[in-house]
Amino acid sequence: MSLRLSSGSRRSYARPSTGSLRGASFGAGNACGVAGIGSGFSCAFGGSSTGGNTGVANSCAGFTVNEGGLLSGNEKVTMQNLNDRLASYLDNVQALQEANADLEQKIKGWYEKFGPGSCRGLDHDYSRYFPIIDDLKNQIITSTTSNANAVLQIDNARLTADDFRLKYENELALHQSVEADVNGLRRVLDEITLCRTDLEIQYETLSEELTYLKKNHKEEMQALQCAAGGNVNVEMNAAPGVDLTVLLNNMRAEYEALAEQNRRDAEAWFQEKSASLQQQITEDVGATTSARNELTEMKRTLQTLEIELQSLLATKHSLECSLTETEGNYCTQLAQIQAQISALEEQLHQVRTETEGQKLEYEQLLNVKAHLEKEIETYCLLIGGDEGACKSSSYKSKDYGSGNAGNQIKDPVKAIVVKKVLEEVDQRSKILTTRLHSLEEKSQSN
C-alpha cells in the first residue's frame, strides 16, 4: 500500500488594484519580479528542506524602492507591517513543521503496522506456503521412517542370510564327510569284490584239477583192468607185492577227503565273508539312502534359501531405487522452493528498495511542495495590500496528485484557503480512502 498526498487548491482573495504579476516562477532558489505603477520591486528566494524537518531560508537579493514605490510614506509603519507578516510567516512555517512531523509520525506508524515485519502491507504473505512446507516436512519424516524400516528389514534379512549361510556351510561339511565315508565304503566294496573274484578263480582251478585227477584215475583203472583181463598166464613164485589197487584206493580216498575238506573250508569262508559283506553292504546302502535323502532335503532347503535371498535382494534394490528417486524428487522440490523463496526475497528487496525510493521521492516532493507553498505565501504576503493581487500558479506532481490555484475578487478582506487531500492507494494504484484537510486564514488588507 502506498500513500499519496495531493495538494488541494490554494486561493487568495484581495481587493482589486492596479498591480500585476508577471513572469513568476517558483522553486528552490527561484526569483520573482513584480512591476507596479510607479514602483520597482525585485526579490530572490532560496529554500531547502532535508529529512522530515522543513527549513526555509529566504534572502532578499535585491530590494529597490523608487520614491513613488511601495515603501513611500511612513517607512516605520511599512517595516512594522513587514515584521507582522514575517511573524505570520514564521507561524505558518511552525504549523507546517508540526503538520510534517504529524505526517512523519503517521508514516512511521503505518510502516510499523504494515511494514516488512508484520507480513502485511508491502511485505509478501508467506503464510500460504507454511502448510505446504509442513506437508513436505511430514512427507520427509515419513520417508525417513520408511527408509529406516527398510534399512532395518535389510539388516534383518542380511543376518538371516548369514545364519542360513552358516547352516549351509555346516551341512556342506557334513555332506562332504558323508561322501568321504561313502567313497571309503566303495573302496572296501571293491576290495571285497576282488577277493570274491579271487576265491571264485581258485575254486574253478581246484575244480578243474579235481576233474583232471578223476579223469587220470579213470584212465589208469581202465588200463589196469585191460591188463588184468588178458590171456597171458604167468606163474611165478615171488614174494607177494604191494596191492596197487588198495594203494590207489587209499590215495583216492585221502585225496577226495582233502579236496572235500578244502571245498568245505573255502565254501564256509566264502559264506562267512559274503554274509559279513552283505550285512555291511546293507548297512552302507541304508546309510547311503539316508544320506542321499538328507542331501536332497538340504538341496531343496538351499534352493528355497537362494530364492528367498534373491527376493530379498530384489526388494532391497527396489527400495534403494525408490529411496533414491524419492530423495531426488524431494531435492528437486526443495531446490524449486528455495528458488521461489530466493525470487520472492529478491522481489521483496526490490519492493523495499522501490518503497524507500518512493518514500524519498515523496519526501522530496512534499518538501518542494511545502517550499513552493511557503514561497507563494511569502510572495503574496510581501506583495499584498493596496498595490497588487496575489495570483498563485498551478503545478502538477507525478505521484502525489495536482494542485490548482486561482484568484477571485470578492471583498476587501483577503482570505487564504489551503486544501490538502490525503489519498491512500494500494499496489494497483486503486484509491482506498480520501481525506480532505482545509486551513483558512483571513487578514485585513492595509
From Swiss-Prot:
Print the keywords alphabetically.
Coiled coil, Cytoplasm, Intermediate filament, Keratin, Phosphoprotein
Q: Where is this region: Linker 12?
A: 225-247
Positions carrying Phosphoserine are S438
Ranges for region Head? 1-74
Q: Where is this region: Coil 2?
A: 248-386
Name the GO terms of the biological process aspect: cytoskeleton organization; hair follicle morphogenesis; intermediate filament organization
Extract the ranges annotated as region (Linker 1): 111-132
Give the InterPro entries listed for this entry: IF_rod_dom, Keratin_I
- Keyword check for Transferase: no
Q: Where in the cell is it found?
A: Cytoplasm
Q: For the region Coil 1B, what residue ranges are annotated? A: 133-224
Picking any one GO molecular function of the record gives: structural molecule activity
Q: Identify the stretch(es) annotated as Coil 1A.
A: 75-110
Region (Tail) location = 387-446
Q: Which residues form the IF rod domain?
A: 75-390
Example of a GO cellular component annotation carried by this entry: cytoplasm
Question: Which family, according to the similarity comment?
Answer: Belongs to the intermediate filament family.
**What interactions and quaternary structure are annotated?**
Heterodimer of a type I and a type II keratin. Heterodimer with type II keratin KRT5 leading to the formation of keratin intermediate filament (KIF) network. Interacts with KRT6A to form filaments.
Its biological purpose is as follows:
Essential for the proper assembly of type I and type II keratin protein complexes and formation of keratin intermediate filaments in the inner root sheath (irs). Plays a role in the cytoskeleton organization.
Q: Reproduce the miscellaneous comment text.
A: There are two types of cytoskeletal and microfibrillar keratin: I (acidic; 40-55 kDa) and II (neutral to basic; 56-70 kDa).
This protein is called Keratin, type I cytoskeletal 25
